[in-house]
Design a protein with these regions (language model features):
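Alpha/beta enzyme core
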Residues: 2-246, 297-307
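Extended, intrinsically disordered, low-complexity segments
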Residues: 7, 249-307
Length: 307
């Protein structure tokens, strides 16, 4: 889509609060809700496109494919979770990141994971009552290997509107790993990364990080517990966290689909779903506009036929 708003420009104006998306409809919902930027979640893409957990199943072709489709129809900047770059060699990472930039990404996260995604394993182990630390689950590659990928991503983004976000996966749960995380973040900044993302989970983490890592920072996925937000956005903005994301639409979509599906299945008719409008809009035209801009394409078709 031409004349898109630039992610870098939005960052210069203030804090951005962005939902994670995974397809054109979730991106459309974000637009209609008023969000000014979108985060393409690697996990949500794996769930929706492949029906698989976030364990490294997604390929660069799949991520490029959905990036291009979302950016073709949505006016807001799309920031892409590019995992470990989908390769070990920095030249492979360079080519992959260049493809994402060409597909329309205005931000790319490049992380230091091994390619074996650890979050799913960590939470699964906890659910089974196993004793496992986040450091054991979220393994990372050697610092210099990751930095070569950061450098390759920066080269792929050079001269474009795409922002490189260096994502440090080293946990902050002990002094040794905290120091390593800060070393990685500082080195990535020295290479030219405009934004840093770390495993911050609370305001205390944010304050510790802000002492060492200056400039733009990304807060990955705010949450809440017992109805209380884990952080206040204004508080973390003061510490340099000007890009904050959250998971919402995969949850909302599954909740809605299960609710409508269960009601219709129970009633053996479509009364429940037909009595509940789409997106809070009353008329059929308004409901259809929540999906796609029908008028634009129908009118354009009519214009082409007017010889």
């Amino acid at each position: 889509m031409e004349n898109k708003v630039k992610f870098r420009d939005l960052l210069s104006e203030g804090q951005i609060f962005a939902p994670c998306v995974y397809d054109c409809l979730s991106a459309r919902a974000a637009d209609l809700c008023g969000y000014k930027a979108l985060m393409l979640s690697g996990g949500a893409v794996s769930y929706s496109m492949d029906g698989l957990p976030d364990m490294g199943f997604s390929t660069i072709d799949e991520v490029v494919w959905i990036t291009e489709r979302i950016t073709n129809v949505n006016p807001w900047p799309l920031i892409v979770d590019a995992d470990d770059g989908f390769g070990e060699s920095p030249v492979v990472v360079y080519r992959n990141m260049h493809r994402l930039v060409k597909a329309g990404a205005m931000g790319i996260t490049i992380d230091d994971s091994t390619g074996i995604r650890g979050a799913e394993r960590f939470f699964y182990a906890l659910a089974k009552g196993e004793k496992i630390t986040i450091s054991e689950a979220m393994k990372v590659v050697p610092r210099d290997l990751w930095l070569t990928k950061v450098k390759a991503t920066l080269a792929a983004c050079e001269g474009t509107d795409c922002v490189t976000i260096a994502r440090v996966g080293v946990p902050l749960n002990n002094q040794e790993s905290f120091i390593e995380a800060m070393e990685r973040a500082v080195r990535a900044k020295e290479l030219g990364a405009e934004m840093i993302m770390l495993n911050v989970h609370n305001l205390e983490d944010a304050r510790r990080v802000a002492k060492y890592v200056k400039g733009w920072k990304m807060w990955p996925d705010v949450t809440s517990k017992d109805g209380v937000p884990d952080v206040n956005l204004d508080d973390v903005y003061e510490l340099g966290f000007n890009f904050v994301t959250m998971h919402i639409f995969e949850k909302a979509a599954m909740y809605g689909m299960m609710k409508y599906g269960l009601e219709n299945f129970k009633n053996q008719n479509a009364v429940y779903s037909e009595m509940h409008d789409m997106g809070g809009y009353a008329t059929f035209k308004q409901q259809m506009m929540t999906l796609v801009d029908h008028e634009k394409w129908i009118d354009l078709e009519a214009d082409f036929k007017n010889l």
